[in-house]
Amino acid sequence: MEQKKLMFHCENIGMQFPGTLALQGVDLDIYEGEIVGLVGENGAGKSTLLKIILGMQTPTYGSMLMHGERYAPQNPKEANRQGVGMVFQEQSLITNLTVGQNIFFGEEKRFAAGPLINYQAMYREAQAVLDTVGLKDVKPGKKVSDLDFATRQMVEIAKVLQGVTNHKNGKSLILLDEPTSVLN
């Protein structure tokens, strides 16, 4: 039997806010291919832990490893470069942009053809990501404002998947903070 490889490890993670201990001594191992759920009451620290893993908050104490290397992202962009992304319950899509522009927001230089953006190439790559999440009928050139709420949330998931796929270790960790609570 093949032994699963450890992808993510956190040890003794703690988070203290003024007057509040949000997390205390959290240990967590996530192996490649594994699906892990964090269950607890409101205020138990689940979202705080996810924000620490994504680099949105710095733990008061503890350490993390990703693919066996020290992991301490300072922001979500740095976490993405190391293969970690997060889909939030609240949507962050820019409604006056197209689906493809949202999926590749901040990465437009990849599609630059001189001073112009090659939207055809961008939309081709965006369609491949949309297909992956079951949105074959959603066209990358469509305005986000024309999508229903549930489809927008699936575009959020596609955006995160696209953002974490090009890193050195090839395996990604996708964090989900109640992203499907609004879906059909």
Predicted regions mapped to residue ranges:
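Glycine-rich phosphate-binding loops of nucleotide-dependent enzymes
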Residues: 2-184
